[in-house]
Amino acid sequence: MNQPQDDIRVAVPEPARRSRWQRFSPSMGWRAFWSEIVIVVLGVVIALAANEAVQEWNWRNKVMDGEARLQGDITWVFLWSAEKSVTQPCVDAQLAAMGRNVLESGDTLRPLPIGTVLDRQWLVRMPTRPYRFPVWEALLADGTASHFPPQRLAILGRISHDMAQARAYEAQTRDLDGALLVMRDPIALDPVVRADLLTNINRLRSLSGTERLYARQRMRMIADAGNAPSDAVVERFLNADGKHPAGSDYSGVVHFCKSRGLPIADWRDYREVGFTVAAPGEGIAK
């Protein structure tokens, strides 16, 4: 017996399950799709590489420009150090004479003569310099310094540190020199005053000797790095014959010492100093 038409059920086949990748089918086809992806990725890589190359080129140019500007500052550091080294024996001789004056004076100090240079009074004629390294400070501030080669970075960093130390020593020297100006007057000498004067004199002698050692080390380091000025430039700055007026461009202390028969050193003796900026075990002192 036939069933009614309404009872006839037609089985509809279920669609086959497709993987996630199969469900996604780009309209241009897979080959074209992956070609587009590769092109985009390559474009990004090339753009990044080009940007990095431009940045590297810019930093390289900044380093080259910085090196050119640094040479002037390095020359001044060498010249100031040479002046400090040459005049230290003269400074020490002046201080030794002051000490003898204190010891040999009776109850009243024999006053010492005062000198004046560029409106500055002094009892001890010694170099006075700014001891600055401004170009390197600027290169540190704008980030250029970090792109210098490691060995060069170490040398320039050491010079910068030495200049900061030299400024600190200069401040101490001026304080002691100012305190000793009292020796221009015939002051009463009791044991306490006599001891204070001798203490300040000997502190200044010790400070001067330490500065000479550091000055010679700086000169050696700069010379070994190939940045030392010529002998003619050094001799002209030291101005031993007094042909040029004392000031920022020429020393007046060397001529002062020489004209009074006070001892001076040879600026070239920095070559006798052993010095290196390498880390322990990485280099041999020269």
Predicted regions and their residues:
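Long, hydrophobic alpha-helical segments that serve as membrane-spanning/inserting helices
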Residues: N2-R31, E52-K286
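Hydrophobic membrane-insertion alpha-helices, especially the h-region
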Residues: E36-A50
